[in-house]
């Protein structure tokens, strides 16, 4: 369940966030699937709106990264102000570092 550090979000707000996130993530995937440049992918309006949702979207980003890997690293860095991966890590290592961090912080199981 999404939460802000120390403050749980209501079930209704959680569902609203999840619905908005799913809609935006689907739009982003659809509109950017043909793009090869990550910088163009992360500059898409739907992606920027997701990052603008703030810390409450972190569990949803991590779930999405676990289930459907994509370029969510910039959104995670923007919403957490943190990067758990080493500088020279491969995309799969970055993914694993984020998922481990998410588990250690209680964002995901």
PLM features: what roles do these ranges have?
Residues 1-109:
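Extended repeat-based scaffolds of very large eukaryotic assembly and lipid-transport proteins
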């Amino acid at each position: 369940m999404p939460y802000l550090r120390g403050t749980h979000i209501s079930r209704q707000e959680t569902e609203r966030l999840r619905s908005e996130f799913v809609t935006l993530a689907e739009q982003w995937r659809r509109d950017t699937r043909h793009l090869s440049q990550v910088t163009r992918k992360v500059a898409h309006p739907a992606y920027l709106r997701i990052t603008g949702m703030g810390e409450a979207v972190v569990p949803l980003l991590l779930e999405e990264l676990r289930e459907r890997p994509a370029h969510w690293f910039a959104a995670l860095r923007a919403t957490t102000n943190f990067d758990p991966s080493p500088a020279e890590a491969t995309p799969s290592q970055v993914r694993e570092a984020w998922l481990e961090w998410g588990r250690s912080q209680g964002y995901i199981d």
